[in-house]
Amino acid sequence: MSTYAYFKISIDGKIQPTIYFELFDNVVPKTVKNFASLCNGFEKDGRCLTYKGSRFHRVIKNFMLQGGDFTRGNGTGGESIYGEKFEDENFELKHDKPFLLSMANAGPNTNGSQFFITTVPTPHLDGKHVVFGKVIQGKSTVRTIENLETKNDDPVVPVVIEECGTCTKDQIEAPKPDVTGDSLEEFPDDYEGDKSETAIFKIASDLKGIANKQFAQQNLDTAVAKWQKALRYLMEYPVPNDDSKESPDFWKEYNALRYSIYANLALVALKQNKPQEAIRNANIVIEASNSTELEKQKAYYRLGCAQGLLKNFEESEKALAKAGNDPAISKKLAEIRQKKKDYKKRQQKAYAKMFQ
């Protein structure tokens, strides 16, 4: 019978979905006992050894997250329940997939309290580190930590184990939808449901609908997060598979969904005064070989607006000239041309003063 454990983690003070682990005590009981005891808190020599309050001090994207140094917090400390270090129990389990829980060490037989969670298969660690568990829920939290900004592999914001302990399988809380009603894994690699072309299209469409609703409510950051999530799922099929049974019309809809999301991201970037992001998203649509003329025109309009914010009036004018003949576009183009004239006048006056 497996042991189960959990971490309630905060990132920069904000509580994340709980991570639950299944521990393999039928394979490595001594290693599991050490981890489980440190989750619950272990009294030793008048001290309580515990992961509670400790942080993840090392994060490497496409590799792993490391924590468990509750004495120094920088990867040089930690202590096991058996003493400072204990031996490698066995290497029966392999690092053959993401979300495995394994012991960090400084060489053979130097296990303490530090552990790591893999985010990809890491076979080069086989025979060197003891695998003793896996993440069974809360994978989105692992991915969120993995994608944090770091400096020298140390997250720039604190990632803290606020609460931890062991539990029974029945005590594991079912995944809860977030405030938008979305309960899907953040990354499609972690999603274990139907990944057919039509299923992915529906998932992305639903996520776009959630994002659009958040946008209408002026929850711009949430809208952006959901649109970006939809794009991650759509990237399961960046181009149709050679053996795809779906019709050309289906793939037109698929691409239209993708490009509408990029256009929306460009729009929000403009609202948030992030012109470079708007330019990046607009250019994806413009440079795509299979985007429609109408999609390109919409993107050119947003590109023109973004260049205008950067006072790149020549580039703004060029983009807006390709955005179609809508009255709103003509008005924006006239506005940019006037701003360009005013800007040149100010420059001329400034230069004239320099030589007086």
Swiss-Prot record:
Reaction(s) the record says it catalyses: [protein]-peptidylproline (omega=180) = [protein]-peptidylproline (omega=0)
Domain of life assignment: Eukaryota
TPR repeats: 204-237, 259-292, 297-330
Catalytic activity, EC: 5.2.1.8
Coiled-coil residue spans: 328-354
Induction note: By heat shock.
Domain (PPIase cyclophilin-type) ranges: 6-166
GO molecular function, one term: peptidyl-prolyl cis-trans isomerase activity
Signal peptide: none
One GO location term (cellular component): cytoplasm
Location(s), subcellular: Cytoplasm
Single GO biological process annotation from the record: protein folding
Keywords, sorted A to Z: Coiled coil, Cytoplasm, Isomerase, Repeat, Rotamase, Stress response, TPR repeat
Role summary: PPIases accelerate the folding of proteins. It catalyzes the cis-trans isomerization of proline imidic peptide bonds in oligopeptides.
Stated family: Belongs to the cyclophilin-type PPIase family. PPIase D subfamily.
Protein name: 40 kDa peptidyl-prolyl cis-trans isomerase
Organism: Schizosaccharomyces pombe (strain 972 / ATCC 24843)
Gene that specifies this protein: wis2
